[in-house]
Amino acid sequence: KNCFLFRKSFMKKIAIIGAGISGLFAANLFSKNSDYQVMIYEKNNSIELDEGYGIQLSTNSIKLLNNIGFNKLEDIDQFNPEQIDFYDLKNQKKICELNISKFNTENCKYTALKRSKLVKFLKNRLDNQVIKYGHNIQKIEKKDDQVVLSFKENSEKVVCDILIISDGI
C-alpha cells in the first residue's frame, strides 16, 4: 500500500515597517523559520552605518541576540563593563554605583558597543532583497485576514499576513 502524507503549509508574509535595530532584529528572527517570508520597508534610501554613538545592551537583550548568532561577534567590537557609576549633572558628584557584572552569565554579559556595529551585524545576516528602501508608508488597511500597505512613492500595494511596525516613532 502506498501512503502519502501531505502537509498543507502556507508561508506567512511578514511586512516590517522600519529598518532600525528592532526591525532588523525581528526580520532576523523570522528569517530563521521557513514558514515566514519577511520584507522590511524602510522610508530612507539606505541604513546609516556611520560610527556614531555607543549603546548598552542588558543581559536579557544579549540572550535574545545570541539566538541569531550575536555571540559570534568579535570581542574587539564590544565591551563588557563591570559597573555603572551615576553622577549628578549639576555638581558632577557621584551618586551611586551599580555592579552590573552580577547579572552576567557565561554567555550573556552586559555589553556596550557602537550602534553601527550592531546595525551592521543585523543587516549583514539578511539577504539583500529583504530590505526595500525608499518605501514611505501612506496607508495601512485591514482586508479580511490580511493587511494591505500603500506607499507614498508609488502605486505599489503590498499584502501581508502579519505587520510589525518598528519605525521608531
Residue ranges and their predicted role:
Residues 1-10:
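Short, Lys/Arg-enriched N-terminal segments with co-localized hydrophobic residues
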Residues 11-22:
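Beta1/beta-strand and adjacent pyrophosphate-binding region of the FAD-binding site
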Residues 14, 31, 58-169:
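Conserved N-terminal helical subregion
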Residues 18, 42, 165:
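Short beta-strand/turn micro-motifs composed of small residues
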Residues 25:
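Conserved SAM/SAH-binding loop-helix junction
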Residues 31-51:
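Glycine-rich FAD pyrophosphate-binding loop
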Residues 53-57:
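Active-site loop of classical SDR/Rossmann-like NAD(P)-dependent oxidoreductases
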